[in-house]
Design a protein with these regions (language model features):
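Hydrophobic/aromatic beta-strand patches that form the interior of the parallel beta-sheet core
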Residues: 93, 155, 186, 218-220
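Extended active-site neighborhood of metal-dependent phosphoesterases/phosphodiesterases
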Residues: 117, 126-135, 139-143, 200-242
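An acidic-aromatic substrate-binding cleft motif
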Residues: 137-188, 193-194
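Conserved ATPase-coupling elements of RecA-like P-loop NTPase cores
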Residues: 197
Length: 242
């Protein structure tokens, strides 16, 4: 079998796998391995990102959600060559934009925040994006749909502050499953119980994975985002960075 036919066969398998996965959008191991195999065969070897390089990939609302979108993620070490690639869904014409490499330390924990805003997008249009570093390290592709003038579904969540966030995570999973057409989700403050505690933010960010990479998020500030470890008030540093 020649290279062209092999690549076409692999892409056909990818399509079948993608069509049969569940409603939740997680990293699909089979999909990823086939996609990487196709890349190697075509001469473009892409290395998958480690979890430590691609934590909490998420979409954030931009000033105009119909023509722009902010993408953010975190890594455990500095990555000066962070990038975002994006394209029209199903297209091969990819555009690349550089992302930040901002260090943030709180509660004795350091993370590196990568962020960029895609602009000049077409309203009510489906795109795909992925994040990475340099020219050869990339995440999986995620979906991104710009807003239009039509009616759309929104998920609105009240306080999610919790002890271990297990129940909150189940709420997010269930609501995402029941509302597959969700175009935006909003959290109305008190995202975490203690705004200075790193564990709270890591667990909260992990719990929104059924939505975060593919649906834009808008949050409002609650008083719990402003608490110190000893329950005094401070600036909401973590909230403002994440």
């Amino acid at each position: 079998m020649n290279k062209k036919r092999l690549i076409i066969s692999l892409l056909a398998i990818i399509t079948v796998v993608g069509a049969t996965v569940g409603s939740y959008v997680y990293r699909d191991t089979i999909y990823s391995r086939i996609a990487r195999t196709a890349a190697v065969v075509s001469g473009q070897e892409i290395k998958p990102l480690l979890d430590s390089e691609s934590r909490y990939i998420r979409q954030i609302v931009a000033q105009d959600n119909s023509t722009s979108r902010t993408i953010m993620w975190q890594s455990d070490s500095s990555e000066a060559d962070a990038v975002i690639e994006y394209r029209l869904a199903g297209s091969e014409n990819t555009q690349t934009i550089g992302a930040t490499d901002k260090v943030f330390t709180d509660d004795g924990s350091t993370t590196y925040i990568h962020e960029a805003t895609l602009t000049g997008l077409t309203p009510k249009t489906k795109y795909e994006y992925r994040v990475g570093y340099g020219s050869d390290r990339r995440s999986d592709w995620y979906s991104l749909e710009t807003a239009g003038a039509s009616v759309y579904d929104v998920l609105i969540y009240p306080d999610s502050q919790s002890g271990d966030y297990s129940q909150w995570e189940e709420i997010v999973k269930d609501s995402a499953h029941r509302n597959p057409r969700t175009a935006l989700y909003i959290s109305l403050g008190d995202l975490v119980d203690n705004g200075e505690q790193d564990y709270q933010w890591r667990t909260w960010l992990n719990s929104i994975r059924p939505l975060s990479a593919n649906v834009p998020l808008a949050t409002t500030l609650g008083n719990h985002e402003m608490y110190t470890l000893d329950w005094k008030m401070r600036e909401p540093y973590a909230y403002l960075n994440y």
